[in-house]
């Protein structure tokens, strides 16, 4: 990157930073007035809407007074006439004689109307006499009809897009770039007016500007003479002022006239001119009565700011030559009379030449130039932060796109530019096209075509179509001669919708664009355009693009915290409603729609910072599982108590590999893989469920662990199983899951017990194991209840059915979690437990083929250590699930890796390599810590550290954070040695070894 480019890049950044500061600090120097000129009232309305939008979104300094002035009475009065109209507006506004329209933001607008009052110069008030004193005024002439780029006729070229994201995340426009680039100029002048042309973007450093004197100052930039021959050039006199104006001279002529410096460069006219207060007062003297105003501001004179106001300021100018200067309109007597007065008022002033270098300007000229700028020419402006793709879902580099959704199944040709449009599946756009403001749904657009949609004031639509190289001033369309200039040819059909208008225009193209009786031209469609519809369409499309981009990221399961950045921290009610409406329509029993639904809600929780959307996400997961789980639930009125009493005792489980992969929604989207083992403690199965007959018509539930027992005679009490603080929630869920009582249906307890043949007593306990052990006791206890009830009823139950009943119980209880715990205790031995990706999980259990010798070695080297602390309740499940749903890369990677390690663990055990298994256990421990930093704490770390030299492998049980720890001892190390070490360090604090044995 050259030094010049680096300078401009940093200057651009400095201006952007300064502008952000001005937005938040009104005490910094800023423009007192920003005035835009417009060609007619319709265009003025469009400009006002644009400025109101920016004020509403805090994109403009509120302290500045903004005015949009159309040419008076709708007449084309030229840029000079428009400038005089600005001066009169400011003078009358200062005097309080203007009757402004007030917009909701409280900002006052000029309406451009000529007020028939007594001449202001008659008895001017004090404020009017000094209207320009101390005022910094920015005027942007933007009243053209944009014939050379018709797609911007309605919105105005001034508000045409610039391919840069503003600091607030919105797409920039030429106007926004003006405000940023010129914000520093206000501080470089004490008072006066800066006049700019609305179709040229200047890139410069405001620190190179100083203007505190009388007269005017022209801002120029250095360019090679070869470029200067196509532009206006200033010739500098000996005093450093503008000596003359040279317009589109050859390189030889520029040399002959002394305009070329020793480096072969000329001073390019940028269209930006600064004027002092004295000069403004002199200009105002030309229109200080109604009669004078009418004489100077009219269609006959059609004064040009550049030809009529600046020429007299050049030191080498003459009145005779001034009369011959090419006018903006025609040579008329009215123009000659005005020039005589202007010469007398201005010729005594000088115009300083301010040379800015390094500097550059970008001219938004013709459609072809625009297309080049937005595609192939983009590279030369990337240092300014310009991008070929702005607010679009498309990442294709062969074409440019701004504020557009382009289907992945649409085909866009190289070198094309798509803006403010929606391209559906099957759409084909040829090479080098400009597509603007339309919806294409499967149509084909030929190469080198402009297609631009407009809403008209009667709520109908027109789509204008012409060649990229067509000149609307000429009588040709797509290279074919037509009867009148394209600008006025009524060849475009009008339809009720934009889609119908697209189809009708494409048919007209195929028919050779015949003149239509009810057709409309470029000119008339511009004049009849509903300018108030432009911003809402762009906003609506911007929302649509962001929504579709988010949905694409959701469907790819990308990181949602990155994906939501497309909204730049802002989300409006319309987007929220659309996303919620979309989510509500999705079927959570269909896997793709389920995945999309939960992530839409999660994205909304990120965007709105509201927990209710995260709750909806988690509720959707629970509901999806619950619907599948309770699908087979039914009350069995034929069930009978076949035995007096049934007691079921089960082992606990230890988790080795893959834990968390069994947790919804991960297992639903990817399947789960878990390696675990059933374990006895002190030779006993500690999980117990007892079912027995009791006399009477009651159902009695008991929890030996909590010492609670209660008789129930109301069915509604038994059906309420979702209260996590209810000591009998598990018992109630077991009765529902096994068909003892109905899930929802109302029936009396008396009828239930009558059908059973007696009352029922269900008791549970976990013998001598502390709560929060991490050994899966809650799920295994649920399995014990199901086994006991089915055995009491004399029913056969397969392992798969058993797993499903327990899953059903856990969903009824709303406990969430995965399926590995119950399988760990219900199926004997060491096994690999798996499931495929599906909403309804089908669990497969495959016993590991482990030799007797390996199992014996494991029993000798494996032991459990109680940490002496109960695992604290945490929102762990919510946290892990949220991070997975969000697409957190680290979480997703860990969940994949722990499954891979589970498979490798099985391999090592089946090969008899306990040392290899121990190393994998250590790797899993590190992954568990990555997934959840709360799985360990100072106490757990200290326990592991204290026995580090005695063990080869370590791991937590369950989610960790307390409860039991598991270790693989080094060969030759005994359990007693570990116990002794723990006693030495922790004494009798409860940290100790528990004897255990793997169930074969």
PLM region descriptions:
Residues 2-96, 128-196, 201-211:
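N-terminal glycine-rich phosphate-binding loop and ensuing alpha1 helix
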Residues 134, 153-154, 160-196, 200-297, ...:
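Conserved core of the sugar-phosphate nucleotidyltransferase
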Residues 155, 159-160, 773-795:
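DPxDG-like acidic metal-binding loop motif
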Residues 95-131:
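Intrinsically disordered, low-complexity terminal tails and inter-domain linkers enriched
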Residues 1-42, 68-69, 82, 87, ...:
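Left-handed beta-helix
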Residues 519-754, 795, 804-816, 822-956, ...:
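C-terminal nucleotide
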Residues 45-46, 148-150, 204-206, 227-229, ...:
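Short helix/loop capping segments that flank catalytic or ligand/cofactor-binding pockets
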Residues 86, 178, 617, 621-625, ...:
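Stable alpha-helical structural segments in soluble proteins, enriched in small hydrophobic residues
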């Amino acid at each position: 990157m050259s030094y010049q480019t680096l300078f401009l890049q940093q200057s651009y950044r400095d201006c952007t930073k300064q502008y952000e500061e001005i937005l938040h600090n009104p005490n910094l120097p800023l423009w007192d007035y920003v005035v835009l000129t417009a060609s007619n009232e319709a265009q003025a309305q469009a400009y006002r809407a644009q400025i109101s939008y920016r004020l509403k979104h805090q994109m403009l300094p509120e302290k500045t007074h903004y005015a949009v002035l159309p040419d008076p009475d709708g007449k084309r009065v030229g840029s000079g006439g428009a400038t005089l109209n600005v001066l009169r507006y400011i003078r009358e506004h200062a005097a309080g004689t203007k009757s402004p329209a007030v917009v909701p933001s409280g900002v006052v607008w000029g309406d451009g109307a000529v007020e028939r009052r007594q001449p202001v110069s008659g008895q001017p008030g004090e404020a009017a006499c000094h209207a320009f004193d101390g005022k910094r005024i920015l005027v942007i002439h933007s009243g053209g009809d944009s014939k050379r780029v018709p797609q911007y006729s309605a919105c105005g070229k001034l508000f045409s897009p610039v391919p840069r994201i503003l600091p607030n995340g919105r797409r920039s426009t030429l106007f926004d770039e003006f405000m940023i680039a010129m914000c520093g100029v206000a501080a470089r002048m004490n008072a006066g007016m800066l006049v700019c042309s609305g179709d040229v973007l200047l890139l410069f450093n405001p620190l190179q500007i100083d203007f505190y004197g009388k007269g005017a100052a022209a801002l120029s930039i250095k360019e090679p003479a070869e470029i200067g021959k196509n532009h206006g050039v200033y010739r500098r006199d000996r005093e450093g002022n503008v000596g003359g104006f040279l317009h589109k001279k050859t390189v030889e002529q520029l040399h002959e006239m002394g305009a070329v410096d020793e480096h072969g460069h000329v001073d390019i006219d940028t269209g930006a001119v600064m004027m002092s207060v004295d000069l403004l007062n002199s200009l105002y003297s030309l229109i200080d009565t109604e009669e004078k105003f009418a004489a100077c501001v009219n269609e006959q004179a059609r004064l040009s700011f550049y030809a009529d106001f600046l020429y007299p300021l050049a030191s080498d100018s003459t009145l005779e030559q001034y009369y011959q200067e090419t006018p903006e309109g025609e040579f008329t007597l009215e123009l000659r009379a005005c020039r005589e007065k202007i010469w007398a008022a201005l010729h005594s002033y000088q115009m300083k030449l301010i040379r800015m270098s390094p500097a550059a300007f970008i001219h938004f000229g013709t459609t072809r130039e625009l297309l080049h700028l937005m595609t192939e020419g983009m590279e030369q402006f990337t240092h300014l932060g310009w991008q070929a793709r702005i607010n679009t879902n498309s990442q294709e580099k062969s074409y440019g796109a701004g504020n557009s959704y382009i289907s992945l199944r649409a085909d866009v040709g190289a070198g094309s530019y798509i803006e403010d449009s929606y391209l559906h599946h099957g759409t084909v756009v040829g090479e080098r096209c400009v597509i603007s403001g339309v919806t294409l749904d499967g149509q084909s657009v030929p190469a080198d075509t402009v297609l631009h949609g407009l809403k008209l004031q009667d709520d109908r639509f027109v789509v204008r179509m012409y060649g990229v190289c067509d000149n609307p001033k000429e009588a040709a369309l797509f290279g074919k001669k037509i009867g009148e200039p394209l600008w006025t040819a009524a060849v475009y059909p009008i339809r009720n919708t934009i889609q119908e208008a697209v189809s009708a225009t494409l048919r007209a193209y195929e028919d050779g664009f015949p003149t239509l009786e009810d057709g409309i031209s470029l000119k008339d469609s511009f004049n009849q355009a509903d300018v108030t519809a432009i911003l809402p369409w762009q906003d609506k499309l911007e929302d649509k693009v962001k929504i579709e981009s988010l949905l694409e990221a959701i469907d790819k399961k990308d990181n949602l915290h990155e994906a939501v950045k497309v909204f730049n921290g802002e989300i409006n009610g319309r987007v929220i409603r659309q996303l919620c409406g979309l989510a509500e329509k999705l079927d959570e029993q269909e896997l793709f729609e389920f995945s999309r639904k939960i992530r839409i809600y999660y994205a909304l929780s990120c965007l709105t910072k509201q927990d209710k959307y995260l709750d909806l996400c988690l509720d959707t997961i629970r509901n999806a599982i619950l619907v599948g789980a309770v699908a087979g639930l039914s009350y069995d009125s034929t069930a009978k108590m076949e035995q007096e009493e049934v007691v079921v005792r089960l082992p606990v489980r230890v988790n080795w590999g893959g834990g968390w992969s069994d947790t919804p929604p991960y297992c639903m989207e990817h399947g789960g893989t878990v390696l675990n083992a059933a374990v006895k403690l002190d030779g006993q199965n500690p999980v117990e469920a007892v079912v027995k007959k009791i006399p009477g018509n009651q159902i009695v539930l008991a929890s030996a662990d909590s010492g609670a027992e209660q008789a129930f005679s109301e069915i509604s009490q038994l059906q309420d199983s979702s209260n996590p603080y209810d000591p009998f929630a598990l018992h109630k869920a077991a009765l529902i899951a096994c068909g003892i009582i109905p899930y929802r249906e109302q029936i009396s307890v008396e009828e239930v017990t009558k059908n059973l043949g007696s009352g029922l007593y269900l008791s549970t306990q976990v013998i001598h194991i502390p709560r929060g052990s991490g050994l899966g006791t809650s799920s295994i206890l649920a399995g014990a209840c199901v086994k006991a009830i089915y055995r009491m009823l004399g029913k056969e139950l397969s392992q798969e059915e058993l797993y499903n009943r327990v899953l059903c119980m856990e969903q009824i209880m709303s406990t969430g979690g995965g399926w590995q715990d119950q399988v760990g205790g219900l199926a004997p031995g060491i096994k690999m437990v798996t499931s495929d990706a599906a909403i309804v999980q089908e669990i497969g259990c495959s016993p590991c083929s482990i030799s007797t010798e390996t199992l014996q070695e494991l029993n000798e080297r494996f032991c459990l250590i109680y940490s002496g602390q109960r695992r604290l309740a945490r929102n762990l499940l919510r946290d892990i699930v949220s991070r997975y749903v969000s697409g957190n890369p680290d979480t997703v990677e860990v969940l994949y890796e722990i499954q891979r390690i589970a498979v490798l663990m099985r391999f090592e055990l089946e090969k008899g390599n306990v040392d290899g298994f121990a190393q994998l256990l250590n790797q899993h421990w590190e992954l568990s810590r990555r997934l959840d930093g709360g799985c360990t704490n100072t106490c757990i770390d200290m326990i592991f550290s204290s026995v580090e030299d005695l063990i080869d492998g370590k791991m937590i049980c369950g989610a960790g954070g307390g409860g039991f720890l598991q270790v693989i001892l080094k060969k030759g190390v005994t359990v007693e040695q570990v116990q002794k070490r723990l006693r030495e360090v922790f004494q009798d604090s409860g940290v100790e070894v528990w004897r255990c044995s793997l169930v074969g």
